[in-house]
């Protein structure tokens, strides 16, 4: 009897972890966008007016729980919880629930960035949160939950990142470290996540997962409710989990400890794609991209060119400030069939702490758009760049096809097909790419969705005529505005 019960428990745990890798996308949609620091009302409108019509699959939203108020309102104050009340500068619980419903109604899922590792860092005296809740972080007193000192690990600093105890039980940059093995802490975290599930979210990005023991997270995840069928989720659907685990290789706490619980952020993807498109590694080597580079298996990897943290760091990672290379890297990211793709939507920043666009009263302001739909008032909105949203459409059009017809010039010019549905060419050399290449597409004329669109039967940008053998003449000049060209069957004239 014991053996049968143990086997049943292991089978259930395995099926739950497998289910937590499913992002619950509509139809052929398969790209998430991180609308970093957007207000809930603005996200709802964006789902209805842009993301849904353009085929985006989901939105990662900023933390929803009450946070500390820090001088100047830096973005990172959102990562210092005071309570689990759903009131932030992005809006209140009613506005959040309205956003989730409206986005689900147009096929755009919502994934919440959640903070299970810690509460706020030290604050002199009494801290007041965005919902008006008082706390004394220095005393580990958070009555809005409530948490007291006994709910936290003993105070210590991470000085050795190769020491598992320090990484998982000491304070990450001074943030008060919760004890996830505590029944009370577990119950409050599960209650918080279940409330979000009740409101209709599809899953969670788990911040600082590396700093929590995988067995504690497994208990929390397995205790969560199924997704809310009133929001279009099938019966018995499990929340999609993707976990922030920074692992550059040879880490004491490894990404592999978390990959069976849900997807894991593949930070090496971000670093290596930046290296390649900055010219530090020839694009020809990208033919074996993915597991061939030592990355996680595709279904366990959350992939991105940059995220809200590493876009602010020096190094290989690309961001919006290098637009030509960034758009090429993003095009490759969305064209190559590896990983669960997320694109970034940023606001402009001059330093690490720059707050989101705000008014004189420190209220987040709504994005404004020019006649082309681009953001103009401090929001970057990379997801509204034609070269990026067009590749979201490309990714949808070629879903479930494989790489064929790889070509390269032995250096930084590459092309490949996605079955007989799509074709991508990139020129990252300082000389032109001008060549007849195999597009693998049926005979006809196709619009390049990078330089323009198919409108009323005509291309507003470049076009390529494909002959009966699948070949077309491809030209990407070294000084062209964009170093990439993309064709797919849904952009055939």
Swiss-Prot record:
Any Gene Ontology CC annotation: extracellular region
SMART domains documented for this protein: Aamy, Aamy_C
SUPFAM superfamilies membership: (Trans)glycosidases, Glycosyl hydrolase domain
Domain of life, source organism: Eukaryota
Cystine crosslinks: 47-103, 156-170, 375-381, 417-440, 447-459
Keyword annotations from UniProtKB, A to Z: Calcium, Carbohydrate metabolism, Chloride, Disulfide bond, Glycosidase, Hydrolase, Metal-binding, Pyrrolidone carboxylic acid, Secreted, Signal
One GO MF term: metal ion binding
Gene3D superfamilies reported for this sequence: Glycosidases, Golgi alpha-mannosidase II
Cofactor: how bound: Binds 1 Ca(2+) ion per subunit. Binds 1 Cl(-) ion per subunit.
InterPro entries reported for this sequence: A-amylase/branching_C, A-amylase_C, Alpha_amylase, Glyco_hydro_13_cat_dom, Glyco_hydro_b, Glycoside_hydrolase_SF
Cellular compartment(s): Secreted
Catalytic activity: Endohydrolysis of (1->4)-alpha-D-glucosidic linkages in polysaccharides containing three or more (1->4)-alpha-linked D-glucose units
Signal peptide (UniProt feature, chain positions): 1-19
Cofactor: Ca(2+); chloride
Major location category of this protein: secreted
Active-site annotation: 207 (nucleophile), 244 (proton donor)
Site-annotated residues for Transition state stabilizer: 309
Claim: Thylakoid is one of the keywords in the record: no
PANTHER family: ALPHA-AMYLASE
Subunit structure, interactors included: Monomer.
Protein family (similarity comment): Belongs to the glycosyl hydrolase 13 family.
Protein name: Alpha-amylase-related protein
Source species taxonomy: Eukaryota, Metazoa, Ecdysozoa, Arthropoda, Hexapoda
């Amino acid at each position: 009897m014991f053996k049968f019960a143990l086997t049943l428990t292991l089978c259930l745990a395995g099926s739950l972890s497998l289910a937590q890798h499913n992002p619950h996308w509509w139809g052929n949609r398969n790209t998430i966008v991180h609308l970093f620091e957007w207000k809930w009302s603005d996200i709802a409108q964006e789902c209805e007016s842009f993301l849904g019509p353009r085929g985006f699959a989901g939105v990662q939203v900023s933390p929803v729980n009450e946070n500390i108020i820090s001088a100047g309102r830096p973005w990172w104050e959102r990562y210092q919880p005071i309570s689990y009340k759903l009131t932030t500068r992005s809006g209140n619980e009613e506005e959040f629930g309205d956003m989730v419903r409206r986005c689900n109604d147009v096929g755009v899922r919502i994934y919440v960035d959640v903070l299970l590792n810690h509460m706020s860092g030290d604050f002199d005296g009494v801290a007041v949160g965005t919902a008006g809740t008082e706390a004394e972080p220095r005393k580990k007193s958070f009555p809005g939950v409530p948490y007291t000192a006994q709910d936290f690990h003993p105070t210590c600093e991470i000085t050795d990142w190769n020491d598992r105890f320090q990484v998982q039980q000491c304070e990450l940059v001074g943030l008060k470290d919760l004890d996830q093995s505590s029944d009370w802490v577990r119950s409050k975290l599960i209650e918080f996540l279940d409330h979000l599930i009740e409101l209709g979210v599809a899953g969670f990005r788990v911040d600082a997962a590396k700093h929590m023991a995988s067995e504690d997270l497994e208990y929390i995840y397995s205790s969560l409710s199924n997704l809310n069928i009133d929001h279009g989720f099938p019966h018995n659907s499990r929340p999609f989990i993707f976990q922030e685990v920074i692992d550059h290789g040879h880490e004491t706490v490894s990404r592999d400890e978390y990959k069976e619980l849900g997807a894991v952020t593949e930070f090496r993807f971000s670093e290596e794609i930046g290296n390649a498109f900055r010219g530090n590694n020839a694009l020809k080597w990208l033919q074996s991209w993915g597991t061939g580079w030592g990355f996680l298996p595709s279904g366990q990897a959350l992939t991105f060119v940059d995220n809200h943290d590493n876009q602010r760091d020096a190094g290989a990672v690309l961001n919006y400030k290098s637009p030509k290379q960034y758009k090429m890297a993003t095009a490759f990211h969305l064209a190559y069939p590896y990983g669960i793709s997320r694109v970034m939507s940023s606001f402009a920043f001059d330093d690490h702490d720059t707050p989101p666009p705000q008014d004189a009263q420190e209220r987040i302001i709504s994005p404004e758009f020019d006649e082309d739909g681009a953001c103009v008032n401090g929001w970057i909105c990379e997801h509204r760049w034609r070269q990026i949203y067009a590749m979201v459409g490309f990714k949808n059009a070629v879903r479930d096809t494989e790489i064929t017809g790889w070509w390269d010039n032995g250096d930084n010019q590459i092309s490949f097909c996605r079955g007989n549905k799509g074709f991508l060419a990139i020129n990252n050399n300082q000389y032109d790419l001008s060549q007849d290449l195999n597009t693998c597409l049926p005979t006809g004329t196709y619009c390049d969705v990078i330089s323009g669109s198919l409108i009323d039967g005509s291309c507003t940008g470049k076009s390529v005529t494909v002959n009966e053998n699948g070949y077309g003449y491809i030209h990407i000049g070294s000084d062209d505005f964009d170093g990439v060209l993309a064709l797919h069957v849904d952009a055939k004239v």
